[in-house]
Amino acid sequence: MVKMRRITPTRLLFTCRYISNNASPPVQPLNVLFFGSDTFSNFSLQALNELRQNNGSCGIVDNIQVVTRSPKWCGRQKSILKYPPIFDMAEKLQLPRPITCDTKQEMLALSKLTPSRQGNPENDGSGAPFNAIIAVSFGKLIPGDLIRAVPLALNVHPSLLPRHKGSAPIQRALLEGDTYTGVTIQTLHPDRFDHGAIVAQTEPLAIATMLSKGRVNDSTADFNSEGLPRRTAILMDQLGALGAQLLGQTLRERLYLPQNRVQAPTAYKPSYAHRITTEDKRIHWARDSAAELLNKLETLGPLHAFKEATAARKDAQNSVLKRILFHECKVMRDARLDNGSKPGMFKYDDIKDCILVTCRGNLLLCVSRLQFEGFAVERAGQFMARLRKRCGALSEKLVFL
């Protein structure tokens, strides 16, 4: 069971006043519209399904209908149709096929659905309606009219709210060097992301401890097809498992009801976890230390810088910038380039088969696998051997920009 602090019923009345404009949260079994998409969502969906399977003894969850985003074409020439990981989990749990919703209109249409006994949602108005929404890493704002149409609307968020509101709480916690993080169960605000009332929250959890545990040995890990960077994948697993426990506890103990006690919100400093952009993955050699770049790589995935190259066309400008992706790196703590080396300068170490790049503080980043724009990922030695052909005379200028 996840540790939670308790508060007085008076405080609870304040935190639970969000739920519906004229209705109390349901105590009858829940027919849940589950909004999710990624690996973090899988854990909560499993916990919810366990409550559904144990319905005879506890009567908490009756039906689950997964709602997710449409699959996307990706890969070279958009040749691969990639489904959100929640699709595979729903199939594994033998739940109805997920409904895909990408627009406000598509989501509002869900208010007409009712779960059928066969497990396929119907819109004929028969049967008990969906009476709960649970959103876990869905990625879109659920319309207020849909939220207000159900008595209960909850969200599982991987941070200690109000710290790291927004779409990238796990990545921002890692990038900003947070010592602790956690999971929050909050209500769904009808108009804004992460502005609901806190229903339950874990104690602060040491990030270093969670990272040391590695991936969760759970069937949800089988469905991590997202190719996440190491640190993000570990923290997503660890927080996903804890969030699932907290969600199960919240529903079993009905912590959302005014007469029940919930965890007291702690006064964490508010912050916003902005969506990860291409600029976040840009290397600034004079600003970033080698350790910071390694943390970025293991949090965001391949980073990029640029290499100046001679223009191939005679009528073009004298030089062009080619994007370089850095895929595999480590920090060299006991090595330095020449005394006159400046951030971004590099040389090849043939013994280690790596490219040594000077970073802020004059420490070196050892790059073993990287990728020149328009070419495949390659070892450092291959990159250096082909640099002349790709950059022309400017290959002699051993500087990443």
Curated annotation (Swiss-Prot):
Its EC number is 2.1.2.9. CDD domains: FMT_core_Met-tRNA-FMT_N (cd08646). Residues 1-26 form a transit peptide. GO terms for biological process: conversion of methionyl-tRNA to N-formyl-methionyl-tRNA. InterPro entries: Fmt (IPR005794), Formyl_trans_C (IPR005793), Formyl_transf_N (IPR002376), Formyl_transf_N_sf (IPR036477), Met-tRNA-FMT_N (IPR041711). It catalyses: L-methionyl-tRNA(fMet) + (6R)-10-formyltetrahydrofolate = N-formyl-L-methionyl-tRNA(fMet) + (6S)-5,6,7,8-tetrahydrofolate + H(+). Phosphorylated by GCN2 in response to nutrient deprivation. Phosphorylation mediates retention of FMT1 in the cytoplasm. It is found in: Mitochondrion; Mitochondrion matrix; Cytoplasm. GO terms for molecular function: methionyl-tRNA formyltransferase activity. It comes from the Eukaryota. Gene3D superfamilies: 3.40.50.12230. Transmembrane segments: none annotated. GO terms for cellular component: mitochondrial matrix; mitochondrion. Keywords: Cytoplasm, Mitochondrion, Protein biosynthesis, Transferase, Transit peptide. NCBIfam families: fmt. Belongs to the Fmt family. Formylation of the initiator Met-tRNA is not essential for mitochondrial protein synthesis in S.cerevisiae. Present with 1070 molecules/cell in log phase SD medium. PANTHER family: METHIONYL-TRNA FORMYLTRANSFERASE (PTHR11138), METHIONYL-TRNA FORMYLTRANSFERASE, MITOCHONDRIAL (PTHR11138:SF5). Formylates methionyl-tRNA in mitochondria and the cytoplasm. Responsible for the formylation of the 8 N-terminally formylated (Nt-formylated) mitochondrial matrix proteins that are encoded by mitochondrial DNA. Nt-formylated proteins in the cytoplasm are strongly up-regulated in stationary phase or upon starvation for specific amino acids (His or Lys) and are targeted for degradation by a PSH1 E3 ubiquitin ligase-mediated fMet/N-end rule pathway. Increased Nt-formylation of cytosolic proteins appears to be important for adaptation to these stresses. This is Methionyl-tRNA formyltransferase, mitochondrial. It comes from Saccharomyces cerevisiae (strain ATCC 204508 / S288c) (Baker's yeast).
